[in-house]
């Protein structure tokens, strides 16, 4: 008897140690940002010609449309990314599904409710229902619904979708929800082939899809219950065969986004925007304090089941960098948004004012997928050979892939611009070429002077002309004279 108890205790203790170790590894923000768990590309890639992408094909459903970017293009395959844009109409429900790859969603427009179902987590939301007869009289039958947490999303939110975790979205607003989804195919969480696969838990994709500028094709995809035998499925779930066939959605032609006639009846707490912001700040402080004491890790329930799945990146008051004459920059990484340790992705939102310039930079530890939300921006990207691989204007609805280490320079057009950049590292960071904390500011004057064959005065001008500006620059240096430089300065040598 004692031996049996000891054996059980040993097994339980070992399981707890494994859980503690895995949780600490997944959620520990001190993970080396220079290291990435991505598998990398399995092919020789050439990033010598970049292009601005628009959706290539779309699949319509009853209450919305899903638009796919060209996943077969070399740039998507080499960066290991998959991108879709989805529109959900009012009272539209994106049916539950899960994916083999983690992803980030940015809500461009609209608001609604969403759910992530983490395995093993308790149903913390409980709701009582009373059935009524057709005459409105209460019947004796009552039932209770229990489910996991429901999250409210709105414009400007970044939503994390871990691989293998079922999720759903519902539009409870008056306008369509428009969202851009970026999936990381090369993430180590994906042990299947390097392709994005969605496993539908309901509905199907037996819809006609249109390829932009080309033909119309038939697209077919059933939910996972369709592959099980009806008898075996009914026995496993304890239901009759009629109900099992409904789960298989064999004759359901609504697609993956379905219309909810009278709206979803959901139990959800309501918070004002101020309350939500205060709660988010409190959670950040609480999370930061937890990291100071590793012994506070308490396994599955403390982390997965209570972790925040969305954060708003559009709020001006939470900008990381702000220039009142140029614009603002806001970022989310695993330090601010712990679930990104599971996703291994991060995001940066940039709002540039009229003719403002973003300090030239390169992404140190990630690829960057830039989606233009509003306005236009002139963009130039340079390769390791010093050649321009992209020089054009990025317009609303277009996507530009910027490979890791490629230098980039952006300038807003007259109407300004707003864009979201999704990056393939949970703690992505950049190296700026100009302004405060830039490469030039970090170099000694003599190094700059001798490297470019210029005087020390000219080197100091290069280092300091942008003063204390960081990130977004004002356009005030257009057509202006730079101290220490003249038209003949190219022939000058260092002192």
UniProtKB/Swiss-Prot annotation:
Residues 50-245, 311-460 form the Cupin type-1 domain. PROSITE patterns: 11S_SEED_STORAGE. Residues 1-24 form the signal peptide. Residues 464-495 are annotated as: Disordered. SMART domains: Cupin_1. SUPFAM superfamilies: RmlC-like cupins (SSF51182). Keywords: Disulfide bond, Seed storage protein, Signal, Storage protein. InterPro entries: 11S_seedstore_CS (IPR022379), 11S_seedstore_pln (IPR006044), Cupin_1 (IPR006045), RmlC-like_jellyroll (IPR014710), RmlC_Cupin_sf (IPR011051), Seed_Storage-Functional (IPR050253). GO terms for molecular function: nutrient reservoir activity. Disulfide bonds join 45-78, 121-305. It holds the Pfam family Cupin_1. The keyword Disulfide bond applies. Seed storage protein. Hexamer; each subunit is composed of an acidic and a basic chain derived from a single precursor and linked by a disulfide bond. Belongs to the 11S seed storage protein (globulins) family. This is Glutelin type-B 2. It comes from Oryza sativa subsp. japonica (Rice).
């Amino acid at each position: 008897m004692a031996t049996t108890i000891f054996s059980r205790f040993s097994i339980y203790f070992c399981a707890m140690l494994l859980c503690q170790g895995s949780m600490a590894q997944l959620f520990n923000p001190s993970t080396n940002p220079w290291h990435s768990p991505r598998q990398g590309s399995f092919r020789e890639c050439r990033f010598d010609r970049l292009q601005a992408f628009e959706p290539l094909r779309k699949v319509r459903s009853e209450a919305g449309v899903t638009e796919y970017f060209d996943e077969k293009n070399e740039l998507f395959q080499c960066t290991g990314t998959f991108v879709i844009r989805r529109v959900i109409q009012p009272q539209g429900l994106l049916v539950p599904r899960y994916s083999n790859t983690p992803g980030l969603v940015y809500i461009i427009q609209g608001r609604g409710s969403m759910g992530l179902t983490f395995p093993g987590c308790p149903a913390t939301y409980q709701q009582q229902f009373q059935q009524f007869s057709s005459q409105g009289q209460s019947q004796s039958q009552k039932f209770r619904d229990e489910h996991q947490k429901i999250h409210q999303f709105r414009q400007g939110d970044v939503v994390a979708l871990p691989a293998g975790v079922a999720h759903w979205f519902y539009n409870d607003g008056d306008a369509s929800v428009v969202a851009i989804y970026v999936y990381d195919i090369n993430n180590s969480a994906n042990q299947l082939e390097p392709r994005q696969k969605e496993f539908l838990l309901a509905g199907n994709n037996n819809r006609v899809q249109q390829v932009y500028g080309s033909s119309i094709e038939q697209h077919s995809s059933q939910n996972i219950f369709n592959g099980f035998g009806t008898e075996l499925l009914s026995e496993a779930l304890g239901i009759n065969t009629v109900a099992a066939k409904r789960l298989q959605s064999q004759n359901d032609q609504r697609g993956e986004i379905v219309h909810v006639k009278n709206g979803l009846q959901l139990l959800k707490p309501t918070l004002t925007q101020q309350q939500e912001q205060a709660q988010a700040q409190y959670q950040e402080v609480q999370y930061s304090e937890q990291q100071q004491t590793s012994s506070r890790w308490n396994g599955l329930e403390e982390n997965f089941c209570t972790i925040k799945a969305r954060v708003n990146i559009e709020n001006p008051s939470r900008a990381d960098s702000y220039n009142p004459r140029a614009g603002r920059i806001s970022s989310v990484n695993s330090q601010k948004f712990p679930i990104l340790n599971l996703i291994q992705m991060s995001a940066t939102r940039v709002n540039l004012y009229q003719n403002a310039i973003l300090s030239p930079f390169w992404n140190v530890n990630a690829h960057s997928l830039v989606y233009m939300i509003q306005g236009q921006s002139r963009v130039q990207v340079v390769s390791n050979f010093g050649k321009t691989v992209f020089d054009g204007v990025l317009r609303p609805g277009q996507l530009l892939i910027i490979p890791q280490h490629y230098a980039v320079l952006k300038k807003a057009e007259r109407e300004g611009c707003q864009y979201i950049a999704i990056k393939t590292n949970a703690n992505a960071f950049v190296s700026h070429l100009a302004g405060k904390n830039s490469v030039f500011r970090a170099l000694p004057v003599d190094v700059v002077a001798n490297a470019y064959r210029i005087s020390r005065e000219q080197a100091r001008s290069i280092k300091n002309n942008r003063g204390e500006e960081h990130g977004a620059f004002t356009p005030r240096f257009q057509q202006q004279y730079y101290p220490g430089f003249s038209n003949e300065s190219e022939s000058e040598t260092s002192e």
